[in-house]
Amino acid sequence: MNTVLKILMAGVDEVGRGPLAGAVVTAAVILKKPIDGLTDSKKLSPKQRNLLAIRIKEEALAFAYGRAEVEEIDQLNIHHATLLAMRRAVEALPIQPDNVFVDGAFTPQLNIPCKAIVQGDSLIPEISAASILAKVLRDEEMVALDKIYPGYGFAEHKGYATPVHKEALMRLGPCKIHRRSYSPVADLISK
């Protein structure tokens, strides 16, 4: 009897550390087999990301999302909130991985061996897949939030500190999904 032991590896990445508004969203992905076209989500067009996200969801052995809400970001800081969201994504996987690879320089606290890989979203297919899923989900959320909080342009800039967003922030003031701990939101509140 020939038994092959397959090590299950999860890739984890985040989207939304830098924006002035919205949650930080993470994904964890365990792939069954390689998927052509996987790379860092920032190197793909929205159309390419959306098509790959469909394939990842169909072909991955498992995937899950994690998040840290604006209140958690403001309370913990973005670094700790991101690690919390990463842990939530891994813990939400329906299958427990043997190893976890995380994009970046830091790893969340897990009861599984975990390694941080700088630029992992360009190097490790599982991290690339996680990058794509997290980006597509967060972008969809920001488009939906644009309808709830009109005037800020969330559908276009996804909460990042663009000139249009800063101008809207000055004109309208912060809304519920703005990160109070982030400048220029904090600067505006303190005036």
From Swiss-Prot:
<dbReference type="InterPro" id="IPR022898">
    <property type="entry name" value="RNase_HII"/>
</dbReference>
<feature type="binding site">
    <location>
        <position position="13"/>
    </location>
    <ligand>
        <name>a divalent metal cation</name>
    </ligand>
</feature>
<dbReference type="GO" id="GO:0006298">
    <property type="term" value="P:mismatch repair"/>
</dbReference>
<feature type="binding site">
    <location>
        <position position="103"/>
    </location>
    <ligand>
        <name>a divalent metal cation</name>
    </ligand>
</feature>
<dbReference type="GO" id="GO:0030145">
    <property type="term" value="F:manganese ion binding"/>
</dbReference>
<dbReference type="GO" id="GO:0032299">
    <property type="term" value="C:ribonuclease H2 complex"/>
</dbReference>
<keyword id="KW-0378">Hydrolase</keyword>
<comment type="function">
    <text>Endonuclease that specifically degrades the RNA of RNA-DNA hybrids.</text>
</comment>
<dbReference type="GO" id="GO:0004523">
    <property type="term" value="F:RNA-DNA hybrid ribonuclease activity"/>
</dbReference>
<keyword id="KW-0540">Nuclease</keyword>
<dbReference type="InterPro" id="IPR001352">
    <property type="entry name" value="RNase_HII/HIII"/>
</dbReference>
<keyword id="KW-0479">Metal-binding</keyword>
<dbReference type="InterPro" id="IPR024567">
    <property type="entry name" value="RNase_HII/HIII_dom"/>
</dbReference>
<dbReference type="GO" id="GO:0003723">
    <property type="term" value="F:RNA binding"/>
</dbReference>
<dbReference type="GO" id="GO:0043137">
    <property type="term" value="P:DNA replication, removal of RNA primer"/>
</dbReference>
<dbReference type="GO" id="GO:0005737">
    <property type="term" value="C:cytoplasm"/>
</dbReference>
<dbReference type="InterPro" id="IPR036397">
    <property type="entry name" value="RNaseH_sf"/>
</dbReference>
<feature type="binding site">
    <location>
        <position position="14"/>
    </location>
    <ligand>
        <name>a divalent metal cation</name>
    </ligand>
</feature>
<keyword id="KW-0963">Cytoplasm</keyword>
<keyword id="KW-0255">Endonuclease</keyword>
<protein>
    <recommendedName>
        <fullName>Ribonuclease HII</fullName>
        <ecNumber>3.1.26.4</ecNumber>
    </recommendedName>
</protein>
<keyword id="KW-0464">Manganese</keyword>
<dbReference type="InterPro" id="IPR012337">
    <property type="entry name" value="RNaseH-like_sf"/>
</dbReference>
<dbReference type="Pfam" id="PF01351">
    <property type="entry name" value="RNase_HII"/>
</dbReference>
<comment type="similarity">
    <text>Belongs to the RNase HII family.</text>
</comment>
<feature type="domain" description="RNase H type-2">
    <location>
        <begin position="7"/>
        <end position="191"/>
    </location>
</feature>
